[in-house]
């Protein structure tokens, strides 16, 4: 059983997770997750966010605990560095610059590009090998290497398809979602009020634009993965010392059976009265502070 502490509404509110988009930009499919509107901006129901976040975190935990691989995806500017930082922190994988078509469905081609990147690095790091090239040729090789690194740095040790994908901004990452659905890979995703929650196995209603919110999500995702990694290593009889010191992507080398999809989580309504009161009081306090 996961030891992940439950996410509370107050922390979500402090991170600005409740702010959706302008009401004119909404996706009607997000209606079940919307609490109301203020100043023509939709307010997300953080009671549902908290419940669904806990479900998503457990999915990440269980995946890594069972030696599965998690791929974090967000190529939007404000999330790019954050995604890479936290994926590396928990020894997982990421795409944060540009999703190349076929990254999942045409892995053979992607593997070829990774091999090309590895060879370029080996050549450029070998002074003797570089002697046979002109300065222009070396400059061209460096440019090719840098371009490949932007797209492949976070998946060069992945070797095969991931067992779970975590996405921030489903609109921008629609190609990644399509490929994951095609391969039956479960998806965890933050869904804003302008998002389409269809095909998302573990939806998390929330602001997918604010840096503070994105960092909050990623810290939770990474902590869940680290706990899963710790349990996995303990089960293997390894003394980790401090799990925070591990960032080696080889710690999760095995493929495991994918988690069963749980699309019915989007219909979660079992939220206790305490959470209701907490959310409404927090919004009231926020209004008072604003005034």
Swiss-Prot record:
Location of the region described as Disordered in the Swiss-Prot/TrEMBL record: 270-291
Task: State the protein's name.
Answer: Small ribosomal subunit protein uS2
CDD domains listed in its UniProt record = RPS2
Family, as annotated: Belongs to the universal ribosomal protein uS2 family.
Q: Which organism is it from?
A: Rickettsia bellii (strain OSU 85-389)
Q: Which Gene3D superfamilies match?
A: Glucose-6-phosphate isomerase like protein, domain 1, Helix hairpin bin
Under the heading PROSITE patterns, the entry gives: RIBOSOMAL_S2_1
| Family annotation (HAMAP family) | Ribosomal_uS2_B (MF_00291_B)
Keywords, A to Z? Ribonucleoprotein, Ribosomal protein
Which GO BP terms, alphabetically?
Answer: translation
Its GO CC terms?
cytosolic small ribosomal subunit
SUPFAM superfamilies registered for this protein in UniProt: Ribosomal protein S2 (SSF52313)
An example of a Pfam family matching this protein is Ribosomal_S2
């Amino acid at each position: 059983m996961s030891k992940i502490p439950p996410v509370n509404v107050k922390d979500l509110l402090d991170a600005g997770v409740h702010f959706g988009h302008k009401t004119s930009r909404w996706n009607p499919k997000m209606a079940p997750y919307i609490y109301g509107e203020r100043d023509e901006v939709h307010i997300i129901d953080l009671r549902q966010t908290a419940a669904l976040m806990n479900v998503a975190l457990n999915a990440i935990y269980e995946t890594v605990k069972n030696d599965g691989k998690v791929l974090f995806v967000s190529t939007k500017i404000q999330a790019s560095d954050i995604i890479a930082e936290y994926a590396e922190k928990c020894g997982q994988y990421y795409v944060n610059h540009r999703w190349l078509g076929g990254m999942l469905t045409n892995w053979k081609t992607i593997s070829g590009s990774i091999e090309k990147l590895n060879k370029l690095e080996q050549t450029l790091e070998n002074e003797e090998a570089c002697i046979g090239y002109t300065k222009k040729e070396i400059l061209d090789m460096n440019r090719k290497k840098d371009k490949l690194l932007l797209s492949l740095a976070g998946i060069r040790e992945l070797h095969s398809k991931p067992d779970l994908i975590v996405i921030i901004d489903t609109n921008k990452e629609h190609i990644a979602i399509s490929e994951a659905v095609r391969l039956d890979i479960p998806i965890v995703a933050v869904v804003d009020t302008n998002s389409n929650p269809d095909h998302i196995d573990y939806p998390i209603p929330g602001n997918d634009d604010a840096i503070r919110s994105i960092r909050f999500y990623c810290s939770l995702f990474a902590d869940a993965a680290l706990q899963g990694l710790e349990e996995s290593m303990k089960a293997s009889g390894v003394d980790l010392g401090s799990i925070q010191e591990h960032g080696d992507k080889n710690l999760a080398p095995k493929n495991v059976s994918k988690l069963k999809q749980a699309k019915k989580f989007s219909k979660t309504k079992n939220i206790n009265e305490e959470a209701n009161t907490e959310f409404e009081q927090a919004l009231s306090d926020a209004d008072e502070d604003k005034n």
